[in-house]
């Protein structure tokens, strides 16, 4: 059976999570009212998100993530083999973040996003310039796994 989602209606239910930072936990994100799991999709979920501030570095070991900007603006920072790439995104733009690539969002004035996110997701719970500089042991000590 097809799943039909009223995106505008679902996003309308959200409250802007203000002042998001890399250390914001999964429990804090869920309790904020700024995140909604709209549907299961393949090996992950379709999420609606509203926040201002800086998100944690994250990566998705099992697939690419689709991100669409609906309202506001954000800078998507992607850590590539050649270093940091930053992309200014505004409403109507879609980004495809490659599998297992560290990335984060910076939205000082606020953004509303729809994502198709594969699970699990690794969130790095410390503010660091380049997550690739951490050893495997350091990563284990600072990664919060999100499973849906």
Language-model segments: which ranges?
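Short, conserved beta-strand element in jelly-roll/cupin
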Residues: 50-52, 61-80, 116
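A short, N-terminal "cap"/entry segment at the start of jelly-roll beta-barrel domains
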Residues: 1-47, 56-57, 138-148
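Short histidine-centered beta-strand/loop micro-motifs
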Residues: 37-40, 56-61, 78-79, 86-88, ...
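Short acidic-glycine-tyrosine-enriched beta hairpin
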Residues: 80-99
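A generic hydrophobic-segment detector
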Residues: 115-148
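Short beta-turn/strand-loop junction motif enriched in small, turn-promoting residues
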Residues: 53-56, 100-102
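Ligand-binding loop in jelly-roll beta-barrel domains
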Residues: 90, 99-127
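Structural motif
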Residues: 45, 66, 73-75, 102, ...
């Amino acid at each position: 059976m097809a799943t039909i989602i009223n995106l505008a209606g679902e996003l309308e239910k959200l409250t802007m999570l203000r002042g998001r930072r890399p250390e914001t936990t999964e429990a804090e994100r869920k309790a904020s009212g700024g995140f909604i799991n709209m549907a299961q999709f393949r090996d992950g979920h379709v999420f609606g998100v509203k926040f201002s501030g800086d998100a944690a570095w994250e990566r998705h070991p099992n697939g690419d993530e689709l991100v669409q900007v609906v309202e506001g603006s954000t800078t998507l920072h992607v850590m590539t083999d050649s270093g940091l790439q930053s992309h200014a995104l505004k409403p109507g733009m879609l980004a495809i973040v490659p599998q297992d690539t560290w990335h984060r969002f910076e939205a000082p004035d606020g953004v509303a996003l729809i994502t198709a996110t594969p699970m699990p997701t690794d969130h790095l719970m410390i503010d660091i310039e380049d997550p690739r500089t951490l050893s495997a042991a350091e990563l284990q000590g600072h990664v919060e796994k999100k499973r849906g």
